């Protein structure tokens, strides 16, 4: 699965905060993924085939398992404006909310430990590379209903540290 310009509006309007992404599945199983932050010349890559994730040539550790109160969350603006599934309470319980407008860049922020959660309505080409990389590093990747993500369907996807995941699922199901 390829997303050549993830964050198209950012590419057009800002000339930054966009990424190119590739997810490779082999015999129906996640194999490798690549997210390239074009403007920062930063390639995050790896997957189950390697059992590791790298940023350029540096192997990355698993992100710290920050609780929701100790981390930043990224939640899509339409979800916040509609308070979809009580997401405003998620924001209040966190250290703050950020939204870049590119799933690839949001996944990089999670993988590098800058955020503890990302919640957005995503299409497969938006989430598959981040799913492969995130799960390789021990992040939780589920639907907002705490179900397995269907890799061929669009859905509201929650990617988070395991601690933040548990707290967010409780808040969005109140």
Regions found by a protein language model. Give the residues of each.
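Residue-level preference for nonpolar/small residues embedded in alpha-helices
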Residues: 16, 82-83, 126
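Buried hydrophobic positions in well-ordered alpha/beta secondary-structure cores of metabolic enzymes
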Residues: 7-8, 73, 110, 134
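Acidic active-site catalytic centers that drive phospho-/nucleotidyl reactions
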Residues: 3-6, 37, 106, 116, ...
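Acidic beta-strand-loop-alpha-helix segment within the catalytic core
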Residues: 21-108, 154-174
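Oxyanion/phosphate-interacting regions
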Residues: 88-91, 108-174
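Flexible, acidic active-site loops/lids enriched in D/E/S/T/G that coordinate Mg2+ and/or position polar
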Residues: 1-27, 34
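Proline- and acidic/polar-enriched loop/turn elements at helix boundaries
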Residues: 7, 36, 102, 122, ...
């Amino acid at each position: 699965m390829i997303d050549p310009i993830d964050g198209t509006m950012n590419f057009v309007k800002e000339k930054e905060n966009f990424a190119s992404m590739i997810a490779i599945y082999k015999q129906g199983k996640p194999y490798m993924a690549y997210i390239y932050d074009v403007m920062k010349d930063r390639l995050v890559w790896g997957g189950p085939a390697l059992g590791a994730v790298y940023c350029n040539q540096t192997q990355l550790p698993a992100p710290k398992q920050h609780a929701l109160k100790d981390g930043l969350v990224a939640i899509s603006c339409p979800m916040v404006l509609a308070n979809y599934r009580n997401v405003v309470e998620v924001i209040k319980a966190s250290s703050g909310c950020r939204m870049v407008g590119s799933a690839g860049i949001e996944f990089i922020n999670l993988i590098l430990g800058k955020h503890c959660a990302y919640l957005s309505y995503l299409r497969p080409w938006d989430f598959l590379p981040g799913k492969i990389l995130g799960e390789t590093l021990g992040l939780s990747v589920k639907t907002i209903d705490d179900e397995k993500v269907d890799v061929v369907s669009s859905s509201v996807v929650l990617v988070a540290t395991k601690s933040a995941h548990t707290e967010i699922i409780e808040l969005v199901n109140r």
